[in-house]
Structure formats: structure tokens, C-alpha cells
Amino acid sequence: MKYRTHRCNELSLSNVGERVRLSGWVHRYRNHGGVVFIDLRDRFGITQIVCREDEKPELHQLVDSVRSEWVLSIEGTVCRRLEGMENANLATGEIEVDIEKVDILSKAKNLPFSISDDHIHVNEELRLEYRYLDMRRGQILDRLVHRHKVMMACRQYMDKQGFTEVVTPILGKSTPEGARDYLVPSRIYPGSFYALPQSPQLFKQILMVGGLDRYFQIATCFRDEDLRADRQPEFAQIDIEMSFGTPNDLFPIIEQLVVEMFAVQGIKIDLPLPRMTYQEAKDLYGTDKPDLRFGLQLHDCREHAKEFSFSIFLDQLAQGGTIKGFCVPGGADMSRKQLDVYTEFVKRYGAMGLVWIKKQESGIASNVAKFASEAVFQAMFADFGAQNNDILLLIAAPEDVANQSLDHLRRLIAKERNFYNEAQYNFVWITDFPLFAKEDGKICSEHHPFTSPLDEDIPLLDKDPLSVRSSSYDLVLNGYEIASGSQRIHNADLQNKIFSILELSPESIKEKFDFFIDALSFGTPPHLGIALGLDRIMMVLTGAEGIREVIAFPKTQKAADLMMDAPAEIMTSQLKELSIKVTS
């Protein structure tokens, strides 16, 4: 049996009079007084099928019994629709198929939600439980097709650039990379475990030691961490590594890769992409992931704050804190009620309050007006570039609190006041991150322990490790980190020194990294790499609300697969075979 001669988006007036066979799902069904209309849908489109009772009574009775989402294969003749009955919203909207034969291939139970009307809001958990039905609503499938095309563009481009695609192991060894590992027990080696890779980091570096020179892979990675809208326990990244290069060699390759990927969606990206150091990003935007679709740059107000008699300003200055803020063009129209809402908003991020200063033709209005002279306010307006009807919003707090609060506030205000176009794509490279950070009183890696320090900062490793900058870089798009990478350490002595600063004992280094240190000791080329978050890129490209919308079978916010009901308990016999006892 041949299931179709055409797809459901292909028939047009040029096919009128042809006998055709179509297969697909019943998208909509209508009985108009003896005339049954069926919208037959496949992945490619919809074709209207018609059956008239007065012409084919037995066939009409069968067709009249079908219901939504039944799978049919029909034969019939292509006809022109009656004048005035055309549907300009369909590629096949000028024709219909007069049915002559129907085969019911599969029936469907009553649906948990509507497939034909994708404007109806459906609870996300219900959508994930019935993901196969959710796919039929169209939007998910469209995004998966776009994802496929982006992946194909990536592979073709990387091949032209001389990169070799290599599949690295999924079962590996647990090594500290920042998040918790997913562990897989070994039946053959009781009490021992594999770890699913958080990234192919060590494997791709060892490929460089092995002389591959240029590697890439669209890799599946796993991290057991708390989830957010743009995080999943398993995710895909475009993983890249190259030998004998510097960031200045790598950046143009990645920039052109971005151009190729976005061209799939018909989006033009201008090159070269701008660059900004980590410190510049923090100073100007309060974050290392700045959204550059709008301005609202931060200004340091500490010198002006010294002229205030406002105790909160003076206390922060005395404690080594900061006073900074930004100017909102036209923001003097903000009501006191709205400013109170913003004040409560920044308190979520640790700020104690929000200072506002309006520049109006009638004069200055501010909640700190009595604490400084008009000359001080005018000097601030000049520094901020404020015009009449603008408002300054300031926060006095420790540096990290002020930055985080202002970062979120500027994003919120920019969105509320339509300061940018959603279809706008602003990239920026962020470079020269700190090599180390301090968490819970301990030094830890800002990226991962295989990142090389900047050459000029290596002497600081012994004296002041927290001031050492790394040869690392992130690519940020519209406030999202979509790629992260670094120059790698290719010297075993330097790698051991970094491990030592991270307070890894010689025993721990030997246990976890002996194979890697050994590899570095056999002649390792300088190398660097990057990983682009494919899920996050697709989220931005398609305008999806989160990465669950661009993944075929995603997990929930609690890392559960509602369709397969995973994770799930396993049989006692399986646990026994793996020498595992469950204690809770």
C-alpha cells in the first residue's frame, strides 16, 4: 500500500483533476448538513477533504464516524474550492480533495487537551506528560526542525574550517567541574561508579595532546544542579578545541559560525563582534552577561555621594561600599507608586532601598532632595547625561549587591518601557575573567581548573591569587551566556600549581587527574577551546520562553520526565546485582 502521493502542503490549482492519496491526522472535523469537511494534517501542512452524503452515502457514513487525531489515508480527486470558500491562510487553501476512499490507520482516545487550537493555554506539566501530543500542535516540531537545520549548518561550517567531529565517551570518571555529577554504578566493579560527563573537557584536551589539532562535537552533557528556565540536567553543546592558537585566532572562527547558524533563520549578524573585559562589564552593567540591546549604563556616584549629608551614602562609603545607578530617559513620569514597586524589587537582591532623582523643568524632585545642594544634583545630571524629564535611580550597597540589584532593575525597566526590539540580537565577547573566586572562605575556579592564567598575571599566583586574571572568554547574546571557553594550561607544572592553590591534596590529584597530568607530560601543544550552548541559542533564535521549548523530551523544573515517569525506583534484584543498598 502506498500511503501518499503528496504531502498535505503540496497540492494547488495545478493539481486540479488529479487522483491523489494523502495520509495524516484529523486536525478538524465539521459536518455541515450532509457534507463532511476534514482538515487532514501531516508535519508539512493541512489539506481540506470533503465528502458529500448525496454522492457517496456509504463512504459518508464511514467518514462521519472519524474523530480528532485519528490517522487516515485517503484517496480522492483534487477540486477547486467554490468561489469565496478559499482559505488564504493555507498553502492548499484554493483546493480541496473530493474523497473516494478512506482507510482508518489508527484511532485516538479522547484528548487531554486540544491539538487543533494552539492558542488555548495548556498546563506545562500536562504538555510534558503528553509530549507526543504537544509536538502535534506544531510549534515544538517547527523548533526541532529549525534546530536540525542549525546543527547541519554548524557541521558543514566546522568541516570546512578543518575541524574533525569526534564522539567522546559518555561513561567517564568523576572529576570536580563545579556541579554535581550523575553517577552510574558498575556491575563488573562493585562499589565503583562511572560519571556522566559535565562536558568533554578532559577528553578534548587529550585529543589535542594526541595531535588531532582541531576537534568539534555536538555533545550531550549532564549536570546534577538546581534548574532554571535556561537549565536542564542534560543539555547539548557545540564543543570545540584547537591547537596552536590564541583567542584572537579562535574568535573569528566562532563569529563566522554564529553568522552561519543565524543565517538559517534569515538573520544577518554584523562582524566583528564587540569585546569587553569582565571588569568593564561589571562597571557598566553590573553583570558579566550584559544585555546590550539598550543603554541604561551604570555610573559610579561615590564622588558625588561625598557631598551629601545622607547617612546611608556616608555609611556605605565608610564601609567600602559603592553608590551607583543609571539614568532612565523620560523616566520622570514614574509615579511614587511605581517607584515603591521598584524599591521592593531591588530588595529581593539585597539592596536596602532605592534613591530616585527626577530632572524636571519645574525643578528637582527626589526622595533625598534635602540632603544635598542643587549644585550637587546638577553635577550628577551632567555626569549621567540626563535631560529634562529623565530620572536617576541609585543604590547604595556593597559592590556585589549594588551590581546585582541594578542589573535586574535595568532589565526590568527596559522591558517595561520597550527600550529594545525583541527581534534584536546584540552579541558581546566578555574577556579576562578572574581565574579564581572565593566561596565559603575557600578559593575555587571561576570557570574550571584547566583554564590558563594570563601570562602577565602568572607571577601573582603565589602572592595574590584572587587578583589573577584568566585567559577566558564568554560570548553573551541579549543577556544570555551562549558560549564559554578559555586558553588551556598545557604545562604539567602549572596545572599542578593551580590544583595546589585550589587546595587539592597530592593524593586527590593523583586519584582524579593522574592520567591527565601524565598526558600533559608528553609534549602538549598550546590549545584552547569553547563550548556553545545549543539549547540556549535555539531558545533565543526561536523566541521560546525557556530551553524546554526547544528540546524534544525535556525534564521539568524538578528534573523529572513526566512522560516516562523518571526517575523511578528499580527492582531489588537490580540493586542487588549492582551491590547497592538504598538507605532512604
Swiss-Prot record:
Keywords: Aminoacyl-tRNA synthetase, ATP-binding, Cytoplasm, Ligase, Nucleotide-binding, Protein biosynthesis. NCBIfam families: aspS_bact, PRK00476.1. InterPro entries: Aa-tRNA-synt_II (IPR004364), aa-tRNA-synth_II (IPR006195), aa-tRNA-synth_II/BPL/LPL (IPR045864), Asp-tRNA-ligase_1 (IPR004524), Asp-tRNA-ligase_1_N (IPR047089), Asp/Asn-tRNA-synth_IIb (IPR002312), AspRS_core (IPR047090), GAD-like_sf (IPR004115). Residues 201-204 are annotated as: Aspartate. This is Aspartate--tRNA(Asp/Asn) ligase. It is found in: Cytoplasm. The gene is aspS. Gene3D superfamilies: Bira Bifunctional Protein, Domain 2, GAD-like domain, Nucleic acid-binding proteins. L-aspartate binds at residues 177, 223, 447, 488. The record marks 32, 84 as: Important for tRNA non-discrimination. Aspartyl-tRNA synthetase with relaxed tRNA specificity since it is able to aspartylate not only its cognate tRNA(Asp) but also tRNA(Asn). Reaction proceeds in two steps: L-aspartate is first activated by ATP to form Asp-AMP and then transferred to the acceptor end of tRNA(Asp/Asn). GO terms for molecular function: aspartate-tRNA ligase activity; aspartate-tRNA(Asn) ligase activity; ATP binding; nucleic acid binding. Its EC number is 6.1.1.23.
